UniProtKB/Swiss-Prot annotation:
Mutation effect (residue 318 to A): 25% glycosyltransferase activity, the protein dimerizes but does not tetramerize, partially restores Fap1 glycosylation in vivo
Family to which this protein belongs: Belongs to the Gtf3 glucosyltransferase family.
Designated name of the protein: Glucosyltransferase 3
Disruption phenotype: The Fap1 protein no longer reacts with a glycan-specific antibody, and migrates as a much larger than wild-type protein. Fap1 is not able to undergo the second glycosylation step. Has defects in biofilm mass accumulation, the biofilm that forms is not as thick as wild-type. Deletion of this gene can be complemented by the ortholog from S.agalactiae strain COH1, but not from S.pneumoniae strain TIGR4 or from S.sanguinis strain SK36.
Length: 330
């Protein structure tokens, strides 16, 4: 038995979707798993025959009895994911579907794809999902895979050093201001440091910082402040279902976080004292203004006691091994 994992390539260097799949694959390779590389492209440039041959090339190394961890979506359209699943099902193998995002739930305009999405999910032997709430939601739409694993949180494997963190009354937020409208509406006297490529007009107290390589970003953030995990109101329901990659990044940097009430990881954050759960931005601003040095240092201590499991990839190691056990064992 050999274990394989799909992995997308060819997207922008800034693509969080690609970064997440690449990170999981790096951990998987360290465990002895093998990569099935998938290039991101416009699939309709292929004829049916060409696409079938492309998929044959992806799965060419498989043997009967192997296990494949299928990271989904591939972002090559739902049609591509369906066809890849169908190709995998031709083999006498076990299939673990690792759901990063559910496209019909992310974007209301894509909800029409839900039935097709659930149909190919149901061909898996095991489903790994970001949260139990996501699993429950998918069951409401007809998912019937009995074996499931909860991811819980994104790791952020790194060896970047952490500087001593002092109380800085500032908030860090990597993200596109065009996607997160609250950035362009920031009217508070606490500065918001936005890490982005985009050149857009921003409020006076929003400080645009150009793209940073990962280790540089973590080291800069490690010097203090708070990491903000936030979405616009229209996306709050989805935030209660999925795992935010930003959360793992902030914690790996060694700084406390501020997150919206209802986030999928809320219990983990509360139980480990990793930051604050707030109802709105105004409450977040009030807390940043009122926190004292001792309280901040205690939060940092909690985060840095917790973050070795993220920096060494243990959430990912756990789901990769647990899902294989579930696939093989009844």
């Amino acid at each position: 038995m050999r274990v394989y994992i799909t992995n997308i390539n060819g997207q922008s260097i800034q693509s969080t979707a690609q970064l997440c799949q690449n990170t999981v694959t790096d951990v998987a390779v360290s465990l002895g798993y093998r990569e099935l590389g998938i290039y991101c492209y416009q699939i309709h440039t292929d004829s049916e025959s060409e696409l079938s041959k492309r998929l044959d090339g992806i799965v060419a190394g498989l043997r009967h009895g192997d296990v494949v961890i299928f990271q989904t979506p591939t972002w090559n359209t739902t049609e591509f994911d369906e066809k890849l699943m169908n190709k995998l099902k031709l083999y006498d193998i076990k299939i673990v579907l690792f759901i990063h995002d559910v496209v019909p739930l992310m974007f209301s305009g894509n909800f029409y794809l839900m039935d097709r999405t659930i149909a190919y999910y149901n061909k898996a032997d095991v489903v790994v999902a970001p949260s139990q709430k996501m699993i429950d939601k998918l069951r409401d739409f007809g998912m019937n895979v009995s074996k499931t694993v909860v991811q819980g949180m994104w790791d952020h494997p790194t060896q970047a050093p952490m500087f001593p963190a002092g109380l800085k009354r500032e908030i860090h937020f990597p993200g596109n201001p065009e996607r997160f409208s609250f950035v362009k509406e920031w009217k508070y006297d606490i500065p918001l440091k936005v890490y982005t490529w985009q050149n857009v007009e921003l409020p006076q107290n929003v400080h645009k910082i150009n793209y940073r390589p990962d280790e540089q970003l973590l080291m800069e953030m490690s010097q203090g402040g708070f990491g903000l995990v936030w979405m616009d109101d229209k996306d709050k329901e989805y935030q209660s279902l999925y795992c935010s990659y930003k959360l793992g990044s902030f914690l790996a940097a060694g700084i406390p976080v501020i997150v919206q009430e209802g986030i999928a990881n809320q219990e983990l954050i509360e139980n480990n004292g990793l930051g604050w759960i707030v109802k709105d931005v105004e409450e977040a601003i009030m807390k940043v203004k009122n926190v004292n040095e001792d309280e901040y240092i205690e939060l940092v201590k909690n985060v840095r006691s917790f973050n070795p499991i993220l920096r060494k990839g243990f959430f990912t190691r756990r789901l990769l091994t647990e899902s294989v056990f579930q696939a093989i064992c009844d």
